[in-house]
């Protein structure tokens, strides 16, 4: 049988080009079996009490820590994340389990209120089995930050993972099995687009959550809407990183490099458009380029390397095409900008200057290690440039004037604003975007309540 992406999910080591695994797409019988298991699992799981479910989250965290190095190595092998960053992803995911186990039950308590001397209570009920379509860039964290609160709320979770990280998908499933999560409460399926469509239409799927591209999110969201099913979309970003004249330059440069080049730049909420007030632009650019040039890139298994390969060769080629288009439009290349020779999908830290709003690097998401620098005349101009985007995931402001920063934050069209620090997701705060970056929220109590039936129970209402 010929193996192609049309028939199989294919995992390829992005550092070497070695084929790691192939897995056939799920057929109709596989999908039906998964949905039957999910329906049965949900019926039983919804009847368990919240304290039991919280304790099972702790068990998931323990099981994940027991396989921490195995999981980190799998992440690095399948999608090229530098090993230290992969280990951090595993640790963060395990800590998420503990945080929701400790704080989640209180977030799901009934909320009584008095209504005209009568009793009304808001209850947080399970919704059903949630279909999750997840990406490859954080192959563990993206799954866990959805699955953990979804399962705590009494729902089931059915995963369709990205085809290039099937090893990660299998290992995550093993972690949940190790923790004693019943079959059907957590499940995964290697489904293609047709299989996803079939599941969205099925009555045993209650809702859908997607992390991915705008194109994928729009397509899946349309199908969920046609089926009248709730969905949460966490999509792309072209996040602005604003540096004003009074900023702490050293701190701003350090945060800018970390915010842009983490995970080899393959982060939806990474800083991508660097909007620098003209009085500090020259000094910032000089230091930023020097710091980016000092980053070590190479074998992601080597702990000394800060950047690894990009996850797929087609993604690297697309990124390079965007760079070439931006240069042809008049931008200036200060660093990088060339595909690396030899094995692996390597692309060097790249810095583009003189980027203006009509250019590709400003208008499109650059999903890789490319920074685009745009000069702003003043703070008001910086704000206008930041909002001049179809995306609205996060934004950063560097300034020593906190009052001005908070005033700007109120006018930024995005889901999260970070003052004197770069964007990161955290269990304690909501994460999500506006505009074409999607809708709905993950994490904190907002993420926990997204997939609850928020039910009003009103006594003596006549």
UniProtKB/Swiss-Prot annotation:
Listed pathway(s): Amino-acid degradation; 4-aminobutanoate degradation
Induction behaviour: By p-hydroxyphenylacetate, succinate semialdehyde (SSA) and putrescine. Highly expressed under several stress conditions together with many genes related to the metabolism of nitrogen compounds.
Keywords: NADP, Oxidoreductase
Pfam families for this protein: Aldedh
Enzyme class: oxidoreductase
Origin superkingdom: Bacteria
Residues where NADP(+) binds: 136-137, 160-163, 212-213, 235, 365
The EC number(s) this enzyme carries: 1.2.1.16
Homology family: Belongs to the aldehyde dehydrogenase family.
Function comment: Catalyzes the NAD(+)-dependent oxidation of succinate semialdehyde to succinate. It acts preferentially with NAD as cosubstrate but can also use NADP. Prevents the toxic accumulation of succinate semialdehyde (SSA) and plays an important role when arginine and putrescine are used as the sole nitrogen or carbon sources.
Entry protein name: Succinate semialdehyde dehydrogenase [NAD(P)+] Sad
Annotated organism of origin: Escherichia coli (strain K12)
């Amino acid at each position: 049988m010929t193996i192609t992406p049309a028939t199989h999910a294919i995992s390829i080591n992005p550092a070497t080009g070695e084929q790691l695994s192939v897995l056939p797409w799920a057929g109709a019988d596989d999908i039906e079996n998964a949905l039957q298991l999910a329906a049965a699992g949900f019926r039983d799981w919804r009847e368990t009490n919240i304290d039991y479910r919280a304790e099972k989250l702790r068990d998931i965290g323990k099981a994940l820590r027991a396989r921490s190095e195995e999981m980190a190595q799998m992440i690095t092998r399948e999608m090229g994340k530098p090993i230290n960053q992969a280990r951090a992803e595993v640790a963060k995911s395990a800590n998420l389990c503990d945080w929701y186990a400790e704080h989640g039950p209180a977030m799901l308590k009934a909320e009584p209120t008095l209504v005209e001397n009568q009793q009304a209570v808001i209850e947080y009920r399970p919704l059903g089995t949630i279909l999750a379509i997840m990406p490859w860039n954080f192959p563990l964290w993206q799954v866990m930050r959805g699955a953990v609160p979804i399962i705590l709320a009494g729902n089931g979770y059915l995963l369709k993972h990205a085809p290039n990280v099937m090893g990660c998908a299998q290992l995550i499933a093993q972690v949940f099995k190790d923790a004693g999560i019943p079959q059907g409460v957590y499940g995964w399926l290697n489904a293609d687009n047709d299989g996803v469509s079939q599941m969205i239409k099925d009555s045993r799927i209650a809702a859908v959550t997607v992390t991915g591209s705008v194109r994928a999110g729009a397509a899946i969201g349309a199908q969920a809407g046609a089926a009248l099913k709730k969905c949460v979309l966490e999509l792309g970003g072209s996040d602005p990183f604003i540096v004003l004249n009074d900023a702490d330059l050293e701190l701003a440069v350090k945060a800018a490099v970390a915010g842009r080049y983490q995970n080899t730049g393959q982060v939806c909420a990474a800083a991508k458009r660097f909007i620098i007030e003209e009085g500090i632009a020259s000094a910032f650019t000089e230091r930023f380029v020097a710091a980016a040039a000092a980053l070590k890139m190479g074998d992601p298994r080597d702990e000394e390397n800060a950047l690894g390969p990009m996850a797929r060769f087609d993604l690297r080629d697309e990124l390079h095409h965007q760079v070439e288009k931006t240069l042809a439009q008049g931008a200036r290349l200060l660093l990088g900008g060339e595909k690396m020779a030899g094995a692996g999908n390597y692309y060097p830290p790249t810095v583009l200057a003189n980027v203006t709003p009509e250019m590709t690097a400003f208008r499109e998401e650059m999903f890789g290690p490319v920074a685009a620098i745009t000069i702003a005349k003043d703070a008001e101009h910086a704000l206008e440039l930041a909002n001049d985007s179809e995306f609205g995931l996060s934004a950063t402001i560097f300034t020593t004037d906190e009052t001005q920063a908070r005033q700007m934050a109120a006018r930024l069209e995005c889901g999260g604003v970070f003052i004197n620090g770069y964007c990161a997701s955290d269990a304690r705060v909501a994460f999500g975007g506006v505009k074409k970056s999607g809708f709905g929220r993950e994490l904190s109590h907002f993420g926990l309540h997204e997939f609850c039936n928020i039910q009003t129970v009103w006594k003596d209402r006549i």
